[in-house]
Amino acid sequence: MREIVHIQTGQCGNQIGAKFWEVVSDEHGIERDGLYKGTNDMQLERISVYYNEIGSNKYVPRAVLVDLEPGTMDSVRSGPLGGLFRPDNFIFGQSGAGNNWAKGHYTEGAELVDSVLDVVRKEAEGTDCLQGFQITHSLGGGTGAGMGTLLMSKIREEYPDRMMCTYSVVPSPAVSDTVVEPYNATLSVHQLVENSDETFCIDNEALYDICFRTLKLSTPTYGDLNHLVSFVMSGITTCLRFPGQLNSDLRKLAVNMVPFPRLHFFMTGFAPLTARGSQQYRAVTVPELTQQMFDAKNMMAASDPRHGRYLTVAAVFRGKVSMKEVEEQMQNVQNKNSAYFVEWIPNNVLSAQCDIPPRGVKMAVTFLGNSTAIQELFKRVSDHFTAMFKRKAFLHWYTQEGMDEMEFTEAESNMQDLIAEYQQYQDATVEEEAEYEEEVPADEES
């Protein structure tokens, strides 16, 4: 089977990672002690993608948990799923990275990285046919951002032909932990552009908006935000974990979603949105789901898709859904909003379906969009970066860890290039390509 090794780094990465394992274990009928108590054969059919079977009926996640301070690890270990993970797979330092990307990437993180790679190697050796790695981390801190990207480049060196997929929480001024988030995020994106194959952008600001506006929560906690993230992660990985036809592994997903290798940053969405603890009391229909899913308010990245165009889209419907109806609705959306889809990629909207719905709802859909509007998110980070960098604010924190200003300049220009590339493809039309084709025969005649 095509296994995936999961790595969670830093406080944020470990928190959303733990939530992910909670949801996935629940969907596959795996108890907190790792024993299978499920009822449906489909739960076991592709269980080996994320779990290692040890002994009869006992499963252990293929997860590596990393942090530069012991605090988060302790809370995962004492949390509901503490007994599920392999004890050797907790790797932590003592000092913390203090929200400093350079500490995570060059000093503290670099000291710990070899012991992490040993565990990753051990997990990779325990697979039949490894398809790739998924990393959960935030881009605003020190460990998840700095050490997370260091791990990615090291894993890339060792497994150059395996997929690398990241769930990256992008910082936002609305929900800010520290003042240097724009630095950490820009330095991280610089790495993600080169070393990741698919990055699912999750944005705290958008998650907060969903909690306020849609779920009517007056004071959302990180627990509420992580609850939303776990919906999306569960939905994206549905195709990987349950038998299905479309996007059934990371590489196929990338083939369908990434038209140009650098443009692999996806917006994610989920419908129907429900708050923690409140289940839905009305049935949803496919048209409602489709409409909700394309709604800007449902996006987990604070970019408005109406300000850009979709290069590619994938939707994963779950529950007892008629595929015919899904196809009709998706076609309908494209016909009505054709201006928002680039016309030079044919069949760029795909739908998959899985019979097992998420807990508590009859039907749900997860949305993945490669939209040029994601540049808004990068612009926002980049503007904050530039404002600070031109005054060299807080730069000494990074230079005293051995970083060079040149690295900041490079990261800044790489971010600007990325924004420009998205803009270029947003403006591209079929006419431009057609003109080019018409010019060629003219030369032959002369």
Swiss-Prot record:
Family of the protein in this entry: Belongs to the tubulin family.
GO MF entries: GTP binding; GTPase activity; metal ion binding; structural constituent of cytoskeleton
Subunit structure: Dimer of alpha and beta chains. A typical microtubule is a hollow water-filled tube with an outer diameter of 25 nm and an inner diameter of 15 nM. Alpha-beta heterodimers associate head-to-tail to form protofilaments running lengthwise along the microtubule wall with the beta-tubulin subunit facing the microtubule plus end conferring a structural polarity. Microtubules usually have 13 protofilaments but different protofilament numbers can be found in some organisms and specialized cells.
Disulfide feature: none
Main location, first listed in the record: cytoplasm
Family matches, as Pfam families: Tubulin (PF00091), Tubulin_C (PF03953)
Name assigned to this protein: Tubulin beta-1 chain
Superkingdom of origin: Eukaryota
Any GO CC annotation of this UniProt entry: cytoplasm
Chain segments annotated as transmembrane: none
Listed cofactors: Mg(2+)
Sequence positions that bind Mg(2+): E69
Keyword Phosphoprotein: no
UniProt keyword terms in alphabetical order: Cytoplasm, Cytoskeleton, GTP-binding, Magnesium, Metal-binding, Microtubule, Nucleotide-binding
SMART domains: Tubulin, Tubulin_C
Subcellular location: Cytoplasm, Cytoskeleton
Binding residues annotated for GTP, in chain numbering: Q11, E69, S138, G142, T143, G144, N204, N226
Any one biological process term the GO annotation gives: microtubule-based process
